[in-house]
Every structure is written in structure tokens, then in C-alpha cells.
From Swiss-Prot:
GO terms for molecular function: sodium channel inhibitor activity; toxin activity. The modification 4-hydroxyproline is found at residues 6-7, 17. This is Mu-conotoxin GIIIB. The lineage of its organism: Eukaryota, Metazoa, Spiralia, Lophotrochozoa, Mollusca. Keywords: Amidation, Disulfide bond, Hydroxylation, Ion channel impairing toxin, Neurotoxin, Secreted, Toxin, Voltage-gated sodium channel impairing toxin.
Length: 22
């Protein structure tokens, strides 16, 4: 649901493209 918190969720392929993961 929220990819930015915690930041480690950025490893998820659905979250990775999000600006907060850049």
C-alpha cells in the first residue's frame, strides 16, 4: 500500500519505480 515507508519496501518491483524510491 505505502511503498515509501519503510524505505526497504523499495526493493519490491511494484514500488521500485516510485519517486520515493529513486
Amino acid at each position: 500500500r505505502d511503498c515509501c515507508t519503510p524505505p526497504r519496501k523499495c526493493k519490491d518491483r511494484r514500488c521500485k519505480p516510485m519517486k520515493c524510491c529513486a
